[in-house]
């Protein structure tokens, strides 16, 4: 039993099977290109999705584990150099810490395969990793799928693209991993596949040996999650003509303002392009005129100063005006033990005392 991290509410016990964990570990070894000469640096907590099964995957191929007691960006750079690390997994928040480290230099992570997931990485972070020589791979998955269920597999023809276009391609969630090659779909309400037009939004569903057996002692939640024989992730996505999936938002996180749907992820990506912003989170808050409106919660980089109106105008110049945050609040963001931002905590704070929530 492995517990979810609690980014959308109370953690739930996820029932794993030995077969599922075994197959996922082998799949991760194949997808990551692990071998007996691999050295894996741990920044991902081993308790989170069982370390995406890398605890077993690295061991199965005879690779080397290098463990961190606490995530310190400066120490990461030192250990990469000292142990000639070849692989590491890291949440987007860890990548942001590395980008902001005083030890950043061109080629500092040369030859290191970095796998990231948990939230769509900002294009700015992707560009920073590339400048340091890292080979960044974006994964998508949940505790319920033993970790990664898709990977943004890098294509050879991307090499000729600009860094901006490469970042855009790599920030997508990608195609199913080896163990779920026919088990991940994006479906409409009738469970039919959405067209591969990069526009039609559906829900990501999964089925296979590396999908959980159910929620521990919660048959109601298990039945709800497996409607139609597929596990419903609650994540909304489109499918591009090349078959790559791109998340647009979680069902719970879509902001409905004046009848318009706003993707909180889209606004967050734009906020992360601002040079002063280290981290950003956007939630819908009560609005008397529009029902709800986007509000941004941001953490600034050390030494930077910026006003809320400057951030709002930055977004208005690059997004449709109704998508730009109406408010901006500065300060640390609530996070889980794995470094994921807890949107529901911010949302509940903002909706406290209101009769209902919209969206």
What is the predicted function of each stretch?
Residues 118, 141, 174, 235, ...:
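Active-site glycine-centered loops adjacent to acidic/histidine catalytic or metal-binding residues
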